[in-house]
Amino acid sequence: VVTALAVPVLLGAAATSQANAVIASWNLKHAGWNNGKHLEQVAAVASHMDLIDLQEVMKEEVVSELEQQLEALTGDEWDSLVSHAVGRSTYTERYAYLYRDKTIAYQGGATVYLDPEDVFSREPLLATFVEKDTGRAFSAANVHIVYGDSKADRSPEIRALADIYDLMKEISPGTPAIIMGDFNMAPTEPAWGDLRTLGLRPLITEGATTLSKTDGRYASLYDNIWYVPSEWPKANGDVFRFPDYLGISHETARADVSDHAPIYLSVTGETLALLPLEGGQPQAAGAEVASRRASKTSSLASQTCIDLNTANADQLDRLPNIGPARAADIIRQRPWSSSGQLTRISGIGQGTLSEIVASGLLCS
């Protein structure tokens, strides 16, 4: 149960009747530990995506911080889902989904796989989303396979992904499903046989996704998206080689961002268009966005205050950094005795709570 509620030559895309959605996966290497991670650079890369699943989230507050970075950078509203901590030993981590509200909607069903045979060290996070432009739903599994001492330690988890795919199809018959994440195993290994038998194929078949310490060199193809090609007939994808985009060395990239590059699936097959950097830094949406948010907050403040115990989802969505998923979680966790308890909600840390209180929208 979820406790609250991831560079090629990039050219401009030709116009199509369907807006493109970009789905990605990224192992963020201990995001949330006090390791000097540069979230503004993470956001600069993630801003090219519409839905991105993250592995190695060590503290859920980092997802809220990244969400705010993305909103400041893109001018769009973003939302997120974060799992509870998973793991068998003293080392635990969380999974997360970040998604752009104007392109992707969370439909429901977020849950950590129950794992009846206790195969997984870190049980995957499942959820269903909708492409807003087409109304098409799809299910996603966010996975981080244990590394262990050898491939023999990883193979049982890889084989058990077939059970997860079967479950996703049982829960949502006829809905396309993808399994994405850091698999710590190349897609050519025999352990993938069960998933291949079900018709799934790896999106990325060439190259590698983990950064070596030598600039321009990548070591292993561990990160991927497994999908049924007939369910995504136009899709293609690639590795986003972010050190090239950010103009940094692999040593710096590994220290400040991650030792994995994200991989992405372009639903319509369009090529990504790189967003401009200024002096090696992303260009924020700036004063226009700040003005728009201030105007929104001002106009909302004049409306009836929001009661955490009686407001509906649309009313709760008016609060800063509260999207549909968090609104649903607030309703589910009622009653609330004080606004301070909102830190129980995934992605709401003290900083976000302060913004909510400062908005003046909550009933006193």
Across the structure, where does each feature detected by a protein language model lie?
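Metal-dependent phosphoester-hydrolase catalytic domains
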Residues: 60, 167-175, 185-289
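Small-residue hinge/turn detector
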Residues: 323-324, 349
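Active-site-proximal beta-strand elements of phosphoester/diester hydrolases
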Residues: 20-30, 107-110, 136-147
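Alpha-helical interaction/regulatory segments in DNA maintenance proteins
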Residues: 299, 331, 340-364
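Bacterial N-terminal signal peptides
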Residues: 2-12
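Structured beta-strand-rich core segments of catalytic domains in phosphoester-bond hydrolases
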Residues: 58-134
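Active-site beta-strand/loop signature of hydrolases that rely on acidic residues for catalysis
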Residues: 23-28, 42-67, 98, 127, ...
